[in-house]
Amino acid sequence: MKEHIFNKFIDNILKHTGLSREDFFSKSQNGEIVLARQTLFYLCSKRGLTTAMIKQYMENNECHLTRPPITYGVSIVEGLLKEDSDLQNVIDKLSIVD
């Protein structure tokens, strides 16, 4: 059930950013792609997915990460939310799961 939430967040992020699924799960360090992944980690953590679950779901998509980048990504987005009030509106839209 939680994997459905993970996948819905990815769909929302890809639609919002215009990124391809292939780019999203690539090893790219492009700022836009990294921020999209960090946003996914943040959304998942706020919905109760553990770091281990996020790591497993990323691996299911051939994107192998250790846990520190996931927790770091969550903290980055939390910091950005404190600085950018418009970002909260984007996060709210991305967090909608049917």
Residue ranges of each PLM-predicted region?
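Short, basic interhelical loop/turn and adjoining N-cap
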Residues: 50-52, 56-72
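DNA major-groove recognition helix of helix-turn-helix
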Residues: 45, 70-81
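General nucleic-acid-binding
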Residues: 1-11, 94
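Short, Lys/Arg-enriched anionic-surface-contact patches
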Residues: 12-37, 65
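N-terminal alpha-helical segment
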Residues: 6, 34-37, 70
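Short Lys/Arg-enriched helix C-cap and helix-to-coil transition segments
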Residues: 79-98
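Short, amphipathic alpha-helical "recognition" segments used to contact nucleic acids or chromatin
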Residues: 33-49
